[in-house]
């Protein structure tokens, strides 16, 4: 009966001088190669959809920053040589999408549009301006160049046109008009047999979220976004795909392992869990129907924890009370956390032991099978923990992946012990003090004082120029 109620409710749902920096970014002008129908300014739709807009704005209340590296300094070692070792915060409200990608140390401190460590693709899940630029420039045009090139263009936070065809008649009539605004996401869904236009309403609801809440990588010279789903969506399928094309995100600076970095694979892990298998969608749990002051139902766009709207989410299907369900979820979360830490401890040792083997004169041939085990172990660990809600979405799959990661890490360490013995090293390889984020970063040679100073200079000088240029071009409200 509760399931019928849910379906009925679904039916109604939806450090150069300042003047130099100024001149560099002032030279950028909008391209008008194609007719653009994507309106990226979210406030444009406030009069037509006031309840949805105000609830979307309320994601700004989810403002707390949680430093994942400070909470777990092991991560610094696992990501040694990669920007995530500098800075990794847990996710917060959608209203901070653009702010957070500007402020993270991972994007560096570029001085010009052609400067910096990361490609344009790093904007891809942050703003409806991405959909506008893809429509305007084409995918090749959008992906071309460095991340800093998009600074004056990608300025509106993740919002309406990311998920809705706001230029359609259906949207004008108050219908949801869901859309995949990223062509690469549409191709990925087709690769797993889910063409968006042929999908049902419930499938489309989750597919829209799956444009961003997925694993992806940067493909080819242009660093275009691609989902590694050609062989399937399970961790082993994606691992097989990456291995076949000899892809790596970076090389760990300690062990010299060609590594894979998982992003935020909620769509994949949700699909593997009981909710996904029963088509209980992202919307059902994170964007329920609620009533406004006049008693009218609307979709709550303050995307958040389902327990915050228990009566409108979990209680539609579950007969247990809130406290009982919270206890179950907490137990699952703790089980995954405990195994996660055990795997990390093994991987930390493996990276330092591999470094010791290289230092002792190990050859590429001797190290290859060991590095392969480290790569596969950390990939499986990462895909499990990068999906922050896996304890709810697919706890069994999370534990399975972590168990497999533990086995692979143990294999690597066994092989390392044997190899080190042939080099005359039979003692335990000592670890440096990595008890805090700062100590771990020092252990891998990061100059965090310099990195932070460069970032602050970028935020004080470059970002204001981006915003001024965006206002001049009509991309931001005054």
Curated annotation (Swiss-Prot):
**Chief place where the protein resides:** periplasm
Q: Tell me the Gene3D superfamilies matching this sequence.
A: Butyryl-CoA Dehydrogenase, subunit A, domain 3, Flavocytochrome C3, Chain A
- Enumerate the residues binding heme: 122, 125-126
The positions annotated for binding heme c 4 are: 282, 285-286, 393
Give me the residues that bind heme c 3, please. 94, 209, 212-213
State which Enzyme Commission number(s) the record gives: 1.7.2.2
* Residue positions binding heme c 2: 160, 163-164, 301
Name the cofactor(s) required for activity, per the record.
Answer: Ca(2+); heme c
The residues that hold heme c 5 are 275, 314, 317-318
Q: How is the cofactor bound?
A: Binds 1 Ca(2+) ion per monomer.
Signal peptide, first to last residue: 1-26
Name under which the protein is recorded:
Cytochrome c-552
Q: What lineage does UniProt assign to this protein's organism?
A: Bacteria, Pseudomonadati, Pseudomonadota, Gammaproteobacteria, Enterobacterales
**Encoding gene (name):** nrfA
